[in-house]
Amino acid sequence: MSSTKTIMETIYLILSLFFFFIFLSLKLLFGPRPRKLNLPPSPSRPFPIIGHLHLLKLPLHRRFLSLSESLNNAKIFSLSLGSRLVFVVSSHAVAEECFTKNDVVLANRPEFLVGKHIGYNSTTMVGAAYGDSWRNLRRIGTIEIFSSLRLNSFVSIRQDEIRRLIICLAKNSQHGFVKVEMKPLFMCLTINNIIRMVAGKRFYGDGTENDNEAKHVRQLIAEVVVSGGAGNAADYFPILRYVTNYEKHVKKLAGRVDEFLQSLVNEKRVEKVKGNTMIDHLLSLQETQPDYYTDVIIKGIILVMILAGTDTSAGTLEWAMSNLLNHPEVLRKAKTEIDDQIGVDRLVEEQDIVKLPYLQHIVSETLRLYPVAPMLLPHLASEDCIVDGYDVPRGTIILVNAWAIHRDPKLWEEPEKFKPERFEKKGEDKKLMPFGIGRRSCPGSGLAQRLVTLALGSLVQCFEWERVEEKYLDMRESEKGTTMRKATSLQAMCKARPIVHKVLDASCP
Protein backbone atom coordinates (compact mmCIF):
# COMPACT_ATOMS: atom_id res chain seq x y z
CA MET A 1 0.00 0.00 0.00
CA SER A 2 2.78 2.36 0.95
CA SER A 3 4.63 1.47 -2.26
CA THR A 4 1.52 2.19 -4.38
CA LYS A 5 1.10 5.59 -2.68
CA THR A 6 4.70 6.52 -3.42
CA ILE A 7 4.27 5.56 -7.09
CA MET A 8 1.10 7.68 -7.38
CA GLU A 9 2.83 10.70 -5.79
CA THR A 10 5.67 10.34 -8.26
CA ILE A 11 3.22 10.19 -11.19
CA TYR A 12 1.40 13.30 -9.93
CA LEU A 13 4.73 15.15 -9.60
CA ILE A 14 5.80 14.18 -13.13
CA LEU A 15 2.41 15.19 -14.57
CA SER A 16 2.49 18.50 -12.68
CA LEU A 17 5.95 19.31 -14.01
CA PHE A 18 4.90 18.25 -17.52
CA PHE A 19 1.85 20.53 -17.58
CA PHE A 20 3.87 23.37 -16.03
CA PHE A 21 6.46 23.20 -18.82
CA ILE A 22 3.66 22.94 -21.42
CA PHE A 23 2.04 26.07 -19.95
CA LEU A 24 5.37 27.92 -19.84
CA SER A 25 6.18 26.96 -23.46
CA LEU A 26 2.76 28.10 -24.71
CA LYS A 27 3.11 31.40 -22.84
CA LEU A 28 6.52 32.04 -24.35
CA LEU A 29 5.29 31.09 -27.83
CA PHE A 30 1.98 32.93 -27.90
CA GLY A 31 2.05 35.31 -24.95
CA PRO A 32 2.98 39.02 -25.17
CA ARG A 33 6.67 39.49 -25.79
CA PRO A 34 8.77 42.02 -23.87
CA ARG A 35 8.73 45.39 -25.58
CA LYS A 36 11.88 46.04 -27.55
CA LEU A 37 13.66 49.05 -26.09
CA ASN A 38 13.89 52.16 -28.23
CA LEU A 39 17.52 53.12 -27.58
CA PRO A 40 19.43 56.05 -29.09
CA PRO A 41 21.59 55.31 -32.15
CA SER A 42 24.91 53.58 -31.61
CA PRO A 43 28.12 54.05 -33.66
CA SER A 44 28.54 50.33 -34.44
CA ARG A 45 27.67 46.85 -33.24
CA PRO A 46 29.36 46.29 -29.87
CA PHE A 47 32.09 43.68 -29.57
CA PRO A 48 31.38 40.71 -27.29
CA ILE A 49 32.24 41.38 -23.63
CA ILE A 50 34.00 44.76 -24.12
CA GLY A 51 31.19 46.44 -26.06
CA HIS A 52 32.37 49.81 -27.41
CA LEU A 53 35.34 50.21 -25.06
CA HIS A 54 37.68 50.12 -28.06
CA LEU A 55 36.13 53.39 -29.26
CA LEU A 56 37.20 55.37 -26.17
CA LYS A 57 40.05 57.73 -27.01
CA LEU A 58 41.32 60.81 -25.23
CA PRO A 59 40.28 63.54 -24.98
CA LEU A 60 36.81 62.09 -24.47
CA HIS A 61 34.88 65.27 -25.28
CA ARG A 62 36.40 65.45 -28.77
CA ARG A 63 35.97 61.72 -29.35
CA PHE A 64 32.32 61.82 -28.31
CA LEU A 65 31.64 64.80 -30.57
CA SER A 66 33.22 62.88 -33.47
CA LEU A 67 30.97 59.88 -32.74
CA SER A 68 27.93 62.16 -32.57
CA GLU A 69 28.82 63.67 -35.96
CA SER A 70 29.25 60.19 -37.46
CA LEU A 71 25.63 59.50 -36.43
CA ASN A 72 24.25 62.46 -38.38
CA ASN A 73 24.90 64.88 -35.50
CA ALA A 74 22.90 62.78 -33.04
CA LYS A 75 21.77 64.79 -30.02
CA ILE A 76 22.09 61.65 -27.92
CA PHE A 77 23.72 58.30 -28.68
CA SER A 78 24.32 55.06 -26.82
CA LEU A 79 27.40 52.99 -26.06
CA SER A 80 27.88 49.61 -24.44
CA LEU A 81 30.97 49.98 -22.28
CA GLY A 82 31.75 46.57 -20.83
CA SER A 83 28.71 45.69 -18.77
CA ARG A 84 27.36 49.26 -18.63
CA LEU A 85 24.89 51.02 -20.92
CA VAL A 86 25.96 54.64 -21.44
CA PHE A 87 24.10 57.51 -23.14
CA VAL A 88 26.12 60.53 -24.31
CA VAL A 89 24.22 63.82 -24.59
CA SER A 90 25.49 66.51 -26.98
CA SER A 91 22.44 68.79 -27.07
CA HIS A 92 21.46 71.62 -24.73
CA ALA A 93 17.76 70.83 -25.14
CA VAL A 94 18.25 67.14 -24.32
CA ALA A 95 20.47 68.01 -21.32
CA GLU A 96 17.73 70.31 -20.02
CA GLU A 97 15.15 67.55 -20.46
CA CYS A 98 17.40 65.17 -18.53
CA PHE A 99 17.81 67.48 -15.56
CA THR A 100 14.43 69.22 -15.40
CA LYS A 101 11.73 66.74 -16.44
CA ASN A 102 13.79 63.74 -15.24
CA ASP A 103 15.88 65.54 -12.64
CA VAL A 104 15.05 63.23 -9.72
CA VAL A 105 15.30 59.98 -11.72
CA LEU A 106 18.71 61.02 -13.09
CA ALA A 107 20.05 62.54 -9.86
CA ASN A 108 22.08 59.48 -8.91
CA ARG A 109 25.80 58.87 -9.49
CA PRO A 110 27.47 55.69 -10.77
CA GLU A 111 30.01 54.21 -8.38
CA PHE A 112 33.44 54.58 -9.94
CA LEU A 113 36.68 53.52 -8.28
CA VAL A 114 37.89 57.04 -7.52
CA GLY A 115 34.63 57.85 -5.74
CA LYS A 116 34.70 54.54 -3.89
CA HIS A 117 38.24 54.80 -2.53
CA ILE A 118 39.20 58.49 -2.59
CA GLY A 119 35.66 59.77 -2.06
CA TYR A 120 35.10 57.83 1.18
CA ASN A 121 32.96 55.09 -0.32
CA SER A 122 31.10 57.64 -2.47
CA THR A 123 29.84 59.62 0.53
CA THR A 124 31.00 63.11 -0.50
CA MET A 125 28.66 65.84 -1.68
CA VAL A 126 29.75 65.16 -5.27
CA GLY A 127 29.68 61.36 -5.32
CA ALA A 128 26.97 60.38 -2.84
CA ALA A 129 23.95 58.43 -4.03
CA TYR A 130 20.80 60.52 -4.28
CA GLY A 131 18.80 60.21 -1.07
CA ASP A 132 18.61 61.46 2.52
CA SER A 133 22.39 61.37 3.03
CA TRP A 134 23.02 63.45 -0.09
CA ARG A 135 20.24 65.90 0.83
CA ASN A 136 21.86 66.42 4.22
CA LEU A 137 25.26 67.01 2.59
CA ARG A 138 23.70 69.46 0.14
CA ARG A 139 22.06 71.29 3.04
CA ILE A 140 25.41 71.51 4.84
CA GLY A 141 27.06 72.82 1.68
CA THR A 142 24.37 75.37 0.94
CA ILE A 143 24.01 76.74 4.46
CA GLU A 144 27.34 76.17 6.18
CA ILE A 145 29.94 76.24 3.39
CA PHE A 146 28.88 78.06 0.22
CA SER A 147 26.30 80.58 1.46
CA SER A 148 26.86 84.23 0.53
CA LEU A 149 27.38 85.06 4.20
CA ARG A 150 30.09 82.40 4.56
CA LEU A 151 31.83 83.35 1.29
CA ASN A 152 31.74 87.04 2.21
CA SER A 153 33.50 86.24 5.47
CA PHE A 154 36.52 85.06 3.46
CA VAL A 155 36.71 87.98 1.02
CA SER A 156 39.79 89.35 2.82
CA ILE A 157 41.64 86.08 2.11
CA ARG A 158 40.84 86.25 -1.62
CA GLN A 159 41.91 89.87 -1.84
CA ASP A 160 45.10 89.26 0.16
CA GLU A 161 46.16 86.30 -2.01
CA ILE A 162 45.54 88.33 -5.18
CA ARG A 163 47.55 91.23 -3.71
CA ARG A 164 50.42 88.81 -3.01
CA LEU A 165 50.24 87.61 -6.62
CA ILE A 166 50.47 91.21 -7.87
CA ILE A 167 53.46 91.93 -5.63
CA CYS A 168 55.19 88.77 -6.86
CA LEU A 169 54.71 89.76 -10.51
CA ALA A 170 55.71 93.37 -9.86
CA LYS A 171 59.08 92.59 -8.28
CA ASN A 172 60.85 92.21 -11.63
CA SER A 173 58.49 94.02 -13.99
CA GLN A 174 58.53 97.64 -12.80
CA HIS A 175 61.12 98.76 -15.35
CA GLY A 176 60.11 96.78 -18.42
CA PHE A 177 58.62 93.58 -19.77
CA VAL A 178 59.73 90.29 -18.23
CA LYS A 179 58.78 86.72 -19.13
CA VAL A 180 56.57 84.99 -16.59
CA GLU A 181 55.44 81.37 -16.17
CA MET A 182 51.79 81.75 -15.20
CA LYS A 183 50.63 78.23 -14.28
CA PRO A 184 52.58 77.87 -10.99
CA LEU A 185 51.48 81.36 -9.95
CA PHE A 186 47.83 80.50 -10.54
CA MET A 187 48.18 77.22 -8.64
CA CYS A 188 49.85 79.10 -5.78
CA LEU A 189 46.95 81.57 -5.72
CA THR A 190 44.17 78.99 -5.76
CA ILE A 191 45.75 76.50 -3.34
CA ASN A 192 46.61 79.19 -0.79
CA ASN A 193 43.13 80.68 -1.08
CA ILE A 194 41.34 77.38 -0.44
CA ILE A 195 43.70 76.04 2.25
CA ARG A 196 43.52 79.35 4.14
CA MET A 197 39.72 79.18 4.02
CA VAL A 198 39.72 75.53 5.09
CA ALA A 199 42.59 75.36 7.59
CA GLY A 200 44.01 78.85 8.05
CA LYS A 201 47.47 78.15 6.60
CA ARG A 202 49.45 79.03 3.48
CA PHE A 203 51.50 76.53 1.49
CA TYR A 204 53.21 78.89 -0.98
CA GLY A 205 55.07 82.19 -0.81
CA ASP A 206 56.12 84.34 2.13
CA GLY A 207 55.19 82.99 5.52
CA THR A 208 55.05 79.33 4.51
CA GLU A 209 56.82 76.79 6.64
CA ASN A 210 57.47 73.79 4.45
CA ASP A 211 58.04 73.81 0.69
CA ASN A 212 57.96 70.00 0.63
CA GLU A 213 54.46 70.03 2.09
CA ALA A 214 53.37 72.46 -0.62
CA LYS A 215 54.76 70.20 -3.34
CA HIS A 216 53.05 67.23 -1.71
CA VAL A 217 49.65 68.97 -1.78
CA ARG A 218 50.04 70.05 -5.40
CA GLN A 219 51.08 66.50 -6.36
CA LEU A 220 48.08 64.99 -4.58
CA ILE A 221 45.68 67.32 -6.38
CA ALA A 222 47.27 66.57 -9.75
CA GLU A 223 47.13 62.80 -9.20
CA VAL A 224 43.47 62.82 -8.15
CA VAL A 225 42.51 64.94 -11.16
CA VAL A 226 44.36 62.63 -13.57
CA SER A 227 42.91 59.49 -11.95
CA GLY A 228 39.29 60.62 -12.10
CA GLY A 229 36.80 61.01 -14.91
CA ALA A 230 34.40 58.85 -16.88
CA GLY A 231 37.02 57.45 -19.26
CA ASN A 232 38.67 54.80 -17.10
CA ALA A 233 38.02 51.44 -18.75
CA ALA A 234 38.38 49.65 -15.41
CA ASP A 235 35.14 51.28 -14.23
CA TYR A 236 33.25 49.49 -17.01
CA PHE A 237 35.24 46.27 -17.36
CA PRO A 238 36.04 45.06 -13.80
CA ILE A 239 38.78 42.58 -14.72
CA LEU A 240 40.94 45.52 -15.86
CA ARG A 241 41.11 46.68 -12.24
CA TYR A 242 43.45 43.79 -11.57
CA VAL A 243 45.16 43.47 -14.96
CA THR A 244 46.20 47.16 -14.99
CA ASN A 245 46.70 47.62 -11.22
CA TYR A 246 44.44 50.67 -11.55
CA GLU A 247 42.45 49.93 -8.39
CA LYS A 248 45.65 49.26 -6.43
CA HIS A 249 46.98 52.66 -7.53
CA VAL A 250 43.73 54.41 -6.55
CA LYS A 251 43.73 52.75 -3.11
CA LYS A 252 47.29 53.92 -2.42
CA LEU A 253 46.42 57.43 -3.56
CA ALA A 254 43.32 57.37 -1.34
CA GLY A 255 45.47 56.54 1.68
CA ARG A 256 47.74 59.52 1.02
CA VAL A 257 44.80 61.86 0.47
CA ASP A 258 43.11 60.73 3.69
CA GLU A 259 46.34 61.12 5.66
CA PHE A 260 46.66 64.73 4.48
CA LEU A 261 43.01 65.62 5.16
CA GLN A 262 43.05 63.99 8.60
CA SER A 263 46.19 65.95 9.48
CA LEU A 264 44.35 69.22 8.70
CA VAL A 265 41.44 68.19 10.92
CA ASN A 266 43.71 67.05 13.75
CA GLU A 267 45.74 70.27 13.68
CA LYS A 268 42.60 72.36 14.17
CA ARG A 269 41.15 69.99 16.77
CA VAL A 270 44.10 70.41 19.17
CA GLU A 271 44.41 74.19 18.80
CA LYS A 272 43.52 76.00 22.01
CA VAL A 273 42.36 79.15 20.25
CA LYS A 274 39.65 78.45 17.71
CA GLY A 275 39.86 80.28 14.40
CA ASN A 276 37.38 81.23 11.70
CA THR A 277 38.24 78.49 9.21
CA MET A 278 35.87 75.99 7.60
CA ILE A 279 37.33 73.18 9.72
CA ASP A 280 36.87 75.20 12.92
CA HIS A 281 33.24 75.78 12.00
CA LEU A 282 32.62 72.12 11.10
CA LEU A 283 34.30 70.88 14.30
CA SER A 284 32.09 73.17 16.37
CA LEU A 285 29.06 71.66 14.62
CA GLN A 286 30.50 68.20 15.30
CA GLU A 287 30.34 68.90 19.04
CA THR A 288 26.59 69.51 18.91
CA GLN A 289 25.65 67.12 16.07
CA PRO A 290 28.27 64.32 16.10
CA ASP A 291 26.10 61.95 14.03
CA TYR A 292 25.93 64.42 11.13
CA TYR A 293 29.42 65.91 11.28
CA THR A 294 31.67 62.86 11.51
CA ASP A 295 35.34 63.12 10.58
CA VAL A 296 34.56 61.30 7.32
CA ILE A 297 31.89 63.87 6.41
CA ILE A 298 34.22 66.76 7.30
CA LYS A 299 37.10 65.29 5.27
CA GLY A 300 34.75 64.72 2.34
CA ILE A 301 33.67 68.37 2.42
CA ILE A 302 37.30 69.53 2.55
CA LEU A 303 38.22 67.20 -0.32
CA VAL A 304 35.45 68.57 -2.54
CA MET A 305 36.43 72.17 -1.74
CA ILE A 306 40.10 71.58 -2.53
CA LEU A 307 39.46 69.72 -5.78
CA ALA A 308 36.75 72.14 -6.94
CA GLY A 309 38.59 75.31 -5.95
CA THR A 310 42.21 74.78 -6.97
CA ASP A 311 43.01 73.02 -10.25
CA THR A 312 39.79 74.15 -11.94
CA SER A 313 40.12 77.83 -11.00
CA ALA A 314 43.82 77.89 -11.90
CA GLY A 315 43.00 76.33 -15.26
CA THR A 316 40.26 78.86 -16.00
CA LEU A 317 42.62 81.74 -15.22
CA GLU A 318 45.25 80.27 -17.54
CA TRP A 319 42.72 79.91 -20.40
CA ALA A 320 41.36 83.42 -19.80
CA MET A 321 44.80 85.05 -19.90
CA SER A 322 45.72 83.02 -22.99
CA ASN A 323 42.57 84.25 -24.73
CA LEU A 324 43.34 87.86 -23.81
CA LEU A 325 46.89 87.55 -25.16
CA ASN A 326 45.58 86.11 -28.42
CA HIS A 327 42.95 88.89 -28.63
CA PRO A 328 44.66 92.15 -27.59
CA GLU A 329 41.59 94.17 -28.63
CA VAL A 330 39.57 92.36 -25.94
CA LEU A 331 42.35 93.01 -23.41
CA ARG A 332 42.32 96.74 -24.26
CA LYS A 333 38.54 96.91 -23.92
CA ALA A 334 38.66 95.20 -20.51
CA LYS A 335 41.41 97.55 -19.33
CA THR A 336 39.44 100.60 -20.45
CA GLU A 337 36.34 99.39 -18.60
CA ILE A 338 38.30 98.90 -15.37
CA ASP A 339 40.11 102.25 -15.64
CA ASP A 340 36.83 104.07 -16.35
CA GLN A 341 34.82 102.39 -13.59
CA ILE A 342 37.45 101.94 -10.86
CA GLY A 343 40.05 104.56 -11.69
CA VAL A 344 43.80 104.33 -11.20
CA ASP A 345 44.03 105.16 -7.50
CA ARG A 346 42.95 101.85 -6.01
CA LEU A 347 42.74 98.15 -6.80
CA VAL A 348 39.56 96.57 -8.06
CA GLU A 349 37.64 94.91 -5.23
CA GLU A 350 35.07 92.13 -5.16
CA GLN A 351 32.14 94.51 -4.74
CA ASP A 352 33.26 96.31 -7.93
CA ILE A 353 32.65 93.26 -10.14
CA VAL A 354 29.00 94.17 -10.65
CA LYS A 355 30.17 97.38 -12.37
CA LEU A 356 32.41 95.45 -14.78
CA PRO A 357 30.07 93.54 -17.13
CA TYR A 358 32.64 93.14 -19.91
CA LEU A 359 35.08 91.49 -17.49
CA GLN A 360 32.30 89.10 -16.48
CA HIS A 361 31.60 88.38 -20.17
CA ILE A 362 35.29 87.46 -20.65
CA VAL A 363 35.04 84.90 -17.85
CA SER A 364 31.76 83.54 -19.28
CA GLU A 365 33.25 83.23 -22.77
CA THR A 366 36.30 81.47 -21.34
CA LEU A 367 34.06 78.98 -19.53
CA ARG A 368 32.07 78.48 -22.73
CA LEU A 369 35.07 77.57 -24.87
CA TYR A 370 37.06 75.86 -22.11
CA PRO A 371 34.62 74.51 -19.49
CA VAL A 372 36.27 73.36 -16.29
CA ALA A 373 34.91 69.84 -16.81
CA PRO A 374 34.32 69.29 -20.55
CA MET A 375 32.42 66.10 -19.67
CA LEU A 376 30.08 66.84 -16.77
CA LEU A 377 30.15 64.45 -13.83
CA PRO A 378 28.23 61.28 -14.79
CA HIS A 379 24.64 60.67 -13.72
CA LEU A 380 22.86 57.35 -13.17
CA ALA A 381 19.23 56.49 -13.91
CA SER A 382 17.64 55.14 -10.71
CA GLU A 383 14.44 54.19 -12.58
CA ASP A 384 13.31 53.70 -16.18
CA CYS A 385 12.48 56.96 -17.93
CA ILE A 386 12.23 58.52 -21.39
CA VAL A 387 14.56 61.21 -22.78
CA ASP A 388 14.16 62.74 -26.24
CA GLY A 389 11.74 59.92 -27.08
CA TYR A 390 14.25 57.19 -26.22
CA ASP A 391 13.99 54.62 -23.44
CA VAL A 392 16.47 55.09 -20.60
CA PRO A 393 16.61 51.80 -18.66
CA ARG A 394 17.35 51.82 -14.96
CA GLY A 395 21.12 51.71 -14.36
CA THR A 396 22.01 53.68 -17.51
CA ILE A 397 24.92 56.11 -17.12
CA ILE A 398 24.29 59.59 -18.58
CA LEU A 399 27.29 61.61 -19.78
CA VAL A 400 26.81 65.23 -20.89
CA ASN A 401 29.34 66.67 -23.33
CA ALA A 402 29.35 70.29 -22.12
CA TRP A 403 32.28 71.12 -24.40
CA ALA A 404 30.28 70.06 -27.49
CA ILE A 405 27.16 71.91 -26.31
CA HIS A 406 29.17 75.08 -25.73
CA ARG A 407 30.41 74.93 -29.35
CA ASP A 408 27.14 73.89 -30.99
CA PRO A 409 26.57 76.07 -34.10
CA LYS A 410 22.81 75.66 -33.64
CA LEU A 411 23.13 77.31 -30.25
CA TRP A 412 25.92 79.86 -30.72
CA GLU A 413 26.83 82.27 -33.49
CA GLU A 414 30.45 81.70 -34.62
CA PRO A 415 30.91 79.14 -31.83
CA GLU A 416 34.68 78.67 -32.31
CA LYS A 417 35.38 82.39 -31.99
CA PHE A 418 36.38 84.03 -28.70
CA LYS A 419 33.76 86.76 -28.52
CA PRO A 420 32.82 88.06 -25.03
CA GLU A 421 30.36 90.50 -26.61
CA ARG A 422 27.96 87.62 -27.28
CA PHE A 423 26.97 87.71 -23.60
CA GLU A 424 25.70 91.28 -23.91
CA LYS A 425 22.57 89.64 -25.34
CA LYS A 426 20.14 88.88 -22.53
CA GLY A 427 19.77 85.20 -21.68
CA GLU A 428 22.93 83.96 -23.40
CA ASP A 429 24.45 82.94 -20.07
CA LYS A 430 21.51 80.56 -19.52
CA LYS A 431 22.98 78.32 -22.24
CA LEU A 432 26.15 77.75 -20.21
CA MET A 433 26.66 74.67 -18.05
CA PRO A 434 30.34 74.68 -16.98
CA PHE A 435 29.39 73.74 -13.41
CA GLY A 436 26.69 71.23 -14.27
CA ILE A 437 22.92 71.57 -14.43
CA GLY A 438 20.02 70.57 -12.22
CA ARG A 439 20.04 69.56 -8.56
CA ARG A 440 23.51 67.97 -8.81
CA SER A 441 25.20 71.10 -10.17
CA CYS A 442 28.34 72.31 -8.38
CA PRO A 443 27.38 74.24 -5.21
CA GLY A 444 30.79 75.95 -5.14
CA SER A 445 30.50 77.67 -8.52
CA GLY A 446 29.95 81.05 -6.84
CA LEU A 447 33.26 80.80 -4.97
CA ALA A 448 35.16 79.84 -8.13
CA GLN A 449 33.69 82.69 -10.17
CA ARG A 450 34.39 85.24 -7.46
CA LEU A 451 38.08 84.34 -7.29
CA VAL A 452 38.61 83.99 -11.05
CA THR A 453 36.84 87.26 -11.95
CA LEU A 454 38.59 89.30 -9.26
CA ALA A 455 42.02 87.82 -10.04
CA LEU A 456 41.63 88.37 -13.78
CA GLY A 457 40.44 91.94 -13.28
CA SER A 458 43.40 92.67 -10.99
CA LEU A 459 45.91 91.31 -13.52
CA VAL A 460 44.39 93.41 -16.31
CA GLN A 461 44.33 96.52 -14.10
CA CYS A 462 47.87 96.24 -12.76
CA PHE A 463 49.96 95.07 -15.74
CA GLU A 464 50.57 95.40 -19.45
CA TRP A 465 50.55 92.02 -21.17
CA GLU A 466 52.04 90.71 -24.40
CA ARG A 467 52.76 87.34 -25.99
CA VAL A 468 56.33 86.05 -25.70
CA GLU A 469 56.40 85.56 -29.48
CA GLU A 470 54.42 87.15 -32.28
CA LYS A 471 52.66 83.91 -33.19
CA TYR A 472 49.40 83.03 -31.49
CA LEU A 473 49.48 80.91 -28.34
CA ASP A 474 48.85 77.19 -28.64
CA MET A 475 45.28 76.67 -27.39
CA ARG A 476 45.21 72.87 -27.47
CA GLU A 477 44.05 71.11 -24.33
CA SER A 478 45.78 68.34 -22.40
CA GLU A 479 44.43 64.83 -22.90
CA LYS A 480 44.89 63.86 -19.25
CA GLY A 481 42.48 64.17 -16.36
CA THR A 482 38.91 65.25 -15.75
CA THR A 483 39.48 69.00 -16.00
CA MET A 484 40.39 71.03 -19.06
CA ARG A 485 43.99 72.21 -18.84
CA LYS A 486 46.27 73.69 -21.49
CA ALA A 487 48.62 71.23 -23.14
CA THR A 488 51.41 73.82 -22.95
CA SER A 489 51.80 76.03 -19.89
CA LEU A 490 51.21 79.73 -20.43
CA GLN A 491 54.22 82.03 -20.62
CA ALA A 492 53.62 85.76 -21.01
CA MET A 493 55.45 89.09 -21.09
CA CYS A 494 54.40 91.31 -18.20
CA LYS A 495 55.11 94.96 -17.26
CA ALA A 496 53.78 96.72 -14.17
CA ARG A 497 51.46 99.70 -14.64
CA PRO A 498 51.80 102.78 -12.37
CA ILE A 499 48.94 101.62 -10.13
CA VAL A 500 51.17 98.78 -8.90
CA HIS A 501 53.28 101.30 -6.96
CA LYS A 502 50.24 101.99 -4.78
CA VAL A 503 49.98 98.29 -4.00
CA LEU A 504 53.69 98.07 -3.18
CA ASP A 505 53.58 101.20 -1.03
CA ALA A 506 50.56 99.88 0.86
CA SER A 507 52.38 96.60 1.55
CA CYS A 508 55.40 98.31 3.10
CA PRO A 509 55.45 98.76 6.91
UniProtKB/Swiss-Prot annotation:
GO terms for molecular function: heme binding; iron ion binding; monooxygenase activity; oxidoreductase activity, acting on paired donors, with incorporation or reduction of molecular oxygen. It is a single-pass membrane protein. One of its GO terms (biological process) is defense response to insect. Its EC number is 1.14.-.-. InterPro entries: Cyt_P450, Cyt_P450_CS, Cyt_P450_E_grp-I, Cyt_P450_sf, Plant_Cytochrome_P450_Monoox. Induction: By the diamond-back moth Plutella xylostella, the generalist herbivore Spodoptora littoralis, infection with P.syringae, jasmonate, cis-jasmone, phytoprostane A1 and 12-oxo phytodienoic acid (OPDA). Belongs to the cytochrome P450 family. May play a role in cis-jasmone-activated defense response to aphids. This is Cytochrome P450 81D11.
